[in-house]
A protein has these predicted regions:
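Anionic, Ser/Thr-rich low-complexity intrinsically disordered regions
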Residues: 1-79
Length: 79
């Protein structure tokens, strides 16, 4: 994959990470609100756990993409 495509993929990943971070923050607020009202929050916590897994996957993808970008940089310098 060419460098521009990798950079675009990285930008897309950063947007996804930001979005999931916002969703996690909102879900935490929902949980606090539910628990504060004495309501069951199990489903909300389950959703939060899923969002946190998704966040981790996006972070792993970002790490791999950054490594790919670094590799393409060093390869371009040696050619």
């Amino acid at each position: 994959m060419d460098r521009d495509a990798v950079q675009q993929r990285l930008a897309d990943i950063e947007i996804r990470i930001s979005s999931v971070q916002q969703q996690i923050a909102e879900q935490r607020k929902v949980i606090v609100k539910l628990e504060g009202a004495g309501q069951a929050a199990e489903h909300a916590k389950y959703l939060l756990a899923g969002l946190e897994l998704l966040y981790g996957a996006h972070r792993d993808n970002r790490t791999a993409t950054l490594a790919e970008l670094a590799l393409s940089s060093s390869t371009a310098k040696t050619n």
